[in-house]
Amino acid sequence: RRQRQMCIRDRYGTVLFFEDQKVVKGLQEAFPSYQDNFPGWSLQTSAMHQLAIWVMLEDVGFGASLQHYNPLIDDEVRRAWNLPGHWHLIAEMPFGLPVTKPGEKEFQPLEERVRVFK
């Protein structure tokens, strides 16, 4: 845990990802047939933005990680940047110069996770 805190402390910056609940609610009201889908679609959009920004940071030589300290830090973040209450914190992405290479990870085989139908 101490090592993780050091890595986060020594970062250059942190990208914070939010979901504007007013926008999601507005879409639910405008398109009631799809209202149950908008929260999930919003999270999927956020995930795509997280990946795109991570790749962009890596492309210019930074290392990054995706963290989820919310809801533990939500109120503090809102106060620090004077953010509206309807902005829901999704994730944090600290970034900086990499000091080590990422460790190897084990994944379930791709053929067990992805199916292609023709």
Would you name each region that the model predicts?
Residues 1-2, 89-118:
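C-terminal helix-cap and adjacent tail motif
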Residues 21-23, 99:
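Active-site/binding-pocket entry motifs
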Residues 62-64, 87-91:
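A short pocket-lining beta-strand/turn micro-motif at the edge of beta-sheets
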Residues 16-17, 94:
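Short, well-ordered beta-strand micro-motif
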Residues 11-14, 90:
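Short, surface-exposed beta-edge/turn micro-motifs
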Residues 82-85:
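Short, hinge-like loop/turn segments at secondary-structure boundaries
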Residues 3-8:
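Short, small-residue-biased leader/transition segments that mark boundaries at the very start
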Residues 15, 21, 28-79:
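Small-aliphatic-rich amphipathic alpha-helix that forms the alpha element of a beta-alpha
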